[in-house]
Design a protein with these regions (language model features):
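A detector for small-residue-rich transmembrane helices and their helix-helix packing motifs
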Residues: 1-201
Length: 201
């Protein structure tokens, strides 16, 4: 039996995390998402184009819950989406979300005058899959960790998107890439809209 693309994606994330534990500085320097502007600490630009994808495979070496919750979300939403649209489409949705999350993170916070360091984590892609799940199965019941109350997927996605927008604009819960999460949702919305377009003969 062939393993799902989502399971393979989780396995790659775990493998990269092991490398991060062994070589944290080198991995973050090369593969985290760094700002387009020079860093005030050293006056250097550390951004490279591949980072708009590779950052999503990195997670905090000092906080195991970072990778744990991201992989839980990836499995929870990704496997169900893959079951309906297939491996290539779920990967396209995920990586489109990762890229739009990165671009949003690079552009929006600096425009708001928010200083940026490096960005890591799969959460932009996971938020994208969350929205795709809500668009595909709006009435499916989900039980979030916070609050642990069953609710339809459309409401879950709406509440989380609203919270991310609120925290991003107000600056609350700093240290979390709120606009990247919203950017990931935009990417997946574009992909799902493309899936729904009628095919021309």
């Amino acid at each position: 039996m062939k393993k799902s693309a989502v399971v393979w994606l989780i396995a790659v994330n775990v493998a990269v995390y092991v490398l991060e534990l062994l070589f944290p500085y080198a991995m973050e320097l090369q593969f985290a998402l760094w700002p387009l502007q020079p860093l005030p600490e050293d006056g250097q630009v550390h951004f490279h184009i591949w980072q708009i994808v590779t950052y999503a495979f990195l997670h905090s070496p000092s906080n195991y819950s970072h990778i744990l919750f991201n992989m839980l979300g990836l499995f929870m939403f990704g496997v169900e989406i893959e079951r309906y649209v297939g491996p290539w489409r779920v990967l396209a949705c995920y990586f489109a979300s990762v890229v739009t999350a990165a671009l949003t993170q690079l552009i929006v916070p600096p425009l708001m005058g928010v200083p940026l360091g490096q960005t890591i984590g799969a959460s932009g892609g996971v938020f994208g899959l969350l929205l795709a799940y809500a668009l595909m199965f709006p009435q499916r019941k989900v039980v979030p960790l916070i609050p642990p109350i069953p609710m339809p997927a459309w409401l879950f996605a709406t509440l989380y998107a609203g919270a991310e927008l609120l925290f991003g604009v107000t600056g609350r819960l700093s240290g979390i890439a709120h606009f990247a999460h919203l950017g990931g949702m935009i990417g997946s919305a574009l992909v799902v809209m493309q899936w729904r377009r009628p095919r021309t003969q």
